Curated annotation (Swiss-Prot):
Name of protein: 4-diphosphocytidyl-2-C-methyl-D-erythritol kinase
Residues annotated as binding ATP: 96-106
EC code(s) of this entry: 2.7.1.148
Protein purpose: Catalyzes the phosphorylation of the position 2 hydroxy group of 4-diphosphocytidyl-2C-methyl-D-erythritol.
Species in which this protein is naturally found: Parasynechococcus marenigrum (strain WH8102)
Molecular functions (GO terms): 4-(cytidine 5'-diphospho)-2-C-methyl-D-erythritol kinase activity; ATP binding
Amino acid sequence: MGTITVTAPAKVNLHLEVLGIRSDGFHELAMVMQSIDLADRLSFQTTADAALTLSCDDPSLSLGEDNLVIRAAQLLRSRSGFNELGAAIHLEKRIPIGAGLAGGSSDGAAALVGLNALWGLGHSRSDLQRFAAELGSDMPFCVAGGSQLCFGRGELLEPLPAVQESLAVLLVKDPRVSVSTPWAYRRCRELQGDRYLSGEDAFEQRRQVLRDMAWTQPIRAAEPPPLQNDLQEVVEPETPAVQAALRLLSTLEGTLAVAMSGSGPSCFALFADPTSCAAAQATLEQQLAAEGLQSWCCNLRPDGVRIEA
């Protein structure tokens, strides 16, 4: 097979709850993650040697071994036992970097899916999700995509009903600002640690509460979901760009909910349909420009990384 192209969608967190600290030192999370159609695009081409090379149309992106695309390619090749395999990979970057939208994780997941097909390895999606969990907490979700309950570090997935309406999100981000995810979790522990749960039994009770909430039904405009993001409580007070984005989104009419995604600084408003979303974006055009904020109208997606036909 010569060349394969894969779409790598971003995600938003519709729910992010920090339950406590696990025995391995990671935070125990309870989340609802949703794929959106803001997406990167990766192409994979076979090479005559074992080299793994990555190029990108965004010169600010690191292309070395710290990039999840390269790390995913190396892991897949190692796990499959074919170290002679190589590939030339090109990344068209559309998801903003350091935005809380899992762009890097989605690109890494796309590398697993794309190279699995390019090299004819035959791994199942569950195999690829397991490999993804070794590389990043968001990566198994990015392989699966759609609407998912995510537990543990984020790697334990429970599918939710597919979205049955044409809901849309208006994303807003300051391109000059990024938020360190490790810092956000450290700050969360400092400020909210006294309310953390302790032990697997307590974690499971809280997971069950989330399972029993409205998330078990398809998201509908008539009954908007109860958004929650524990990290927003600690990031917003210390990040003026998040404050500005949430303030502007909260002024819009017709929003179903407004929240920060992940560790930020991207924020979003949920709308009943793409037309309402686009109208809201137009309404805010001058204010967004004055604040130096970028925006995207996005539809919800039912899947994760996908090989293009």
